[in-house]
Amino acid sequence: MRRFDFLSDNIGYMRRIVCKKGGGFLYLHEQSIMSIVGARPAARAVLRGDEKHPGLRGYADFFPYRCGTVVIAELWGLPQDPGPCASNIFAMHIHATGDCTGDMDMSFSSAGGHYNPKNCPHPAHAGDMPPLFSNRGYAWQGFYTDRFTPWEVMGRSVIIHAKRDDFTTQPSGDAGDRIGCGVILGLR
């Protein structure tokens, strides 16, 4: 069984994603999604945790699709707050620089700020992505965006933050410490 075969039963709500560019409409259907995620991605970030989160690992794949990108992310080893009401939600952003080094004050500080080529306020940065919902330390998500193509983000980094993004606080959503990082590299 391919890793994305299970999507066919759970994708009804994504039967149609509409994107208007250049006067035309784009309809993304189940068959299109299956052909996208079954192909080799154009780019991938292999993620690792910082010194406080050495078990954090994962990847984010970037697939070109029409006027944007399908992103598939899978992570494991995310920190967990105990209790039945803990949110365990983590912000995930593309940052401007493809450098996962840091300093004593901040892990992965060399990644810079959010990728924001049009100088938009948060949460309209091109690098703002949906949050990760962790389930006992594991998270998987897939989404479509027209904010960037895979080629526009190659050489940049994906950062996982310790908290959820509040989608309000400027300049970056009060998402907390940087706990994971991976440089986006081209694969084709």
For each feature predicted by the language model, list its residue ranges.
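N-terminal leader/targeting pre-sequences
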Residues: 2-188
